[in-house]
Structure formats: C-alpha cells, structure tokens
Amino acid sequence: MCAARMAAAAQSVYSFSAHPLAGGEPVNLGSLRGKVLLIENVASLUGTTVRDYTQMNELQERLGPRALVVLGFPCNQFGHQENAKNEEILNSLKYVRPGGGFEPNFMLFQKCEVNGAKASPLFAFLREALPPPSDDPTALMTDPKFITWCPVCRNDVSWSFEKFLVGPDGVPVRRYSRRFPTIDIEPDIQALLSKGSGGA
C-alpha cells in the first residue's frame, strides 16, 4: 500500500513501524501504546542540531520514566543536512555535531523522506493529522532551490526538526515548527503525562 493510502487509512501512529538506525527488526509503534511520543525529523548538520539533539536527550532523560518516548527520524531532504549513511550518523553526532562524545539516549531510526511521493507513511499520516505547525501556521518551504521532492503539498514539513507530539492514545496532538525549541514543548508533554496518569 502506498504511503498516502496507508496514511489515509490510519487512525493513530500505532499503524506504523520503523527500522532502528542500529539495524534489527522494525519497531512497531503499537508497542508504545500508552506512552506520550515526541517525533522529530532530525539532521546532523542543521543550525539547530546541537540545540535540538541535546534538548531531546534532556526530555528523554527527565520524562522517560514518566512514559515519554522521544523518536528521531534522520532526513536529508532539507539542504542535504543529513548526507551521511545510516551507519555514519552516530559517529557524526558523537564527534562532529553536537560532538564532545554526544550519544542520543532516545530511539533513532533509519533515514527516511518526510515529504513527497516517497514520504514515510508515518510522516504522511502526521502531516495529514496536523497540517500546520501550531506556533507558525504559515510555515512553508519558501526557497524553491531547496524543494527536492514532488508533489509539493501545503502540509509539507518545512525543514529539519519539526516536532509532532502524540498522545498516549496514539493520536497526534500538536505540531511545532523548526523554530520552536524542543525543550519548550515540555509543558504540553507534562499535561499529556498528567492526563494519562489520571492527573497524578
């Protein structure tokens, strides 16, 4: 089934799976039922790589015990800022950017496309469920030379490090632009975690 048809048929992220960056069996997102998910398309050479990767680690470390799961999906569609091979990405993060021995403590998956005909079915679904980022409803890729995919849609991801927050029922709740710092999503995450635990 093509990505668009899979996305149209889905009611939650639990319909999708993804291949871990380290290899092995695909992770069925249904196995994360009951967790709050923060999903980001990431890149090793973006201007916000250091900020967002370190903040993703921070949120996973502090809120993971309360049922937050951070998921990163490397993508090379924006300025070719993830041009490493899958097997090179962890070393790039460790030694280049963020560097200093950095290791992600959250799940990273194999490179995928998030826009266009070859978009990951998960991202096609997320874009349909949450068309504009909540903090920047007019966010668009505005420089034609950077548009490397087809077809171009109004709900396309506009750059690396867009964020999608998914509730414990697997339904997307909110989308944030690349300009929105990952750490600033914490109040929304805390609200979902409290709701999921009955307000405890």
UniProtKB/Swiss-Prot annotation:
During periods of oxidative stress, Sec-46 may react with a superoxide radical, irreversibly lose hydroselenide and be converted to dehydroalanine. It is found in: Cytoplasm; Mitochondrion. Keywords: Acetylation, Cytoplasm, Lipid metabolism, Mitochondrion, Oxidoreductase, Peroxidase, Phosphoprotein, Selenocysteine. InterPro entries: Glutathione_peroxidase, GPX_AS, GPX_CS, Thioredoxin-like_sf. It catalyses: 2 glutathione + H2O2 = glutathione disulfide + 2 H2O; a hydroperoxy polyunsaturated fatty acid + 2 glutathione = a hydroxy polyunsaturated fatty acid + glutathione disulfide + H2O; tert-butyl hydroperoxide + 2 glutathione = tert-butanol + glutathione disulfide + H2O; cumene hydroperoxide + 2 glutathione = 2-phenylpropan-2-ol + glutathione disulfide + H2O. The modification N6-acetyllysine is found at K85, K111, K118, K145. Its main location: cytoplasm. One of its GO terms (biological process) is arachidonate metabolic process. One of its GO terms (cellular component) is mitochondrion. Its EC number is 1.11.1.9, 1.11.1.12. The modification N6-succinyllysine is found at K85, K111, K145. Transmembrane segments: none annotated. PROSITE patterns: GLUTATHIONE_PEROXID_1, GLUTATHIONE_PEROXID_2, GLUTATHIONE_PEROXID_3. The active site is at U46. GO terms for molecular function: glutathione peroxidase activity; phospholipid-hydroperoxide glutathione peroxidase activity. Catalyzes the reduction of hydroperoxides in a glutathione-dependent manner thus regulating cellular redox homeostasis. Can reduce small soluble hydroperoxides such as H2O2, cumene hydroperoxide and tert-butyl hydroperoxide, as well as several fatty acid-derived hydroperoxides. In platelets catalyzes the reduction of 12-hydroperoxyeicosatetraenoic acid, the primary product of the arachidonate 12-lipoxygenase pathway. Homotetramer. Interacts with MIEN1. Belongs to the glutathione peroxidase family. This is Glutathione peroxidase 1.
